[in-house]
Amino acid sequence: FYTRSFTDAEKALSQGKKVLLNPEKEEINGLEGKFVQVFWSPVHFPNQPGTMGIFCDPTHPALADFPTEMHSNWQWWDICKNATIMELDSLKNNMQPIVRMVDNFYKNRNLSLLFEAKAGDGKLLVCSSDLAKSLNTRPVARQLRYSLLKYMESDKFNPQEEVTFKQIKQVLHNVNRTKEEKKSIYE
């Protein structure tokens, strides 16, 4: 079951379904998706939006039909530019993302573009990059979506970590955090 709505995902998970939750990036309370690293040093320019790249396991079955290395490469450009990066620190259960966005050493948060978990009676995959819009002109997003849905249909989709609906909502819509402001590094 693919949805962009947390409410629909919660309902489907309560019914024991497998869900790919792909919220609108504007609805996610996180960091602006960037492909390039932070400029210079976060010590001197601490409020820069951006991360230090991607770290993932290219052999993870969720990425079986999405060619990648364990690090950022050009196929990730569109995925990152059309994403809001999720911060998983509030989960407090050592959640290991499928696709980790590497934070800078100054903040060192647990950042994710893609993670999986058991939720309610179902199984959940959350992707914070837009996998819905303009897929006819975005072959990379189309391929990642295909790979994730194929993974969910398989017996290999068996998340180990468990999260509550409240925790998922916190990651996506935490009212206690605000999006990092987009500032020029020269201000």
Where are these regions (language model features)?
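Short amphipathic C-terminal alpha-helix that caps PH/PH-like domains
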Residues: V140-E153
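Short, well-ordered secondary-structure micro-motifs within conserved domains or adaptor modules
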Residues: F1-V38
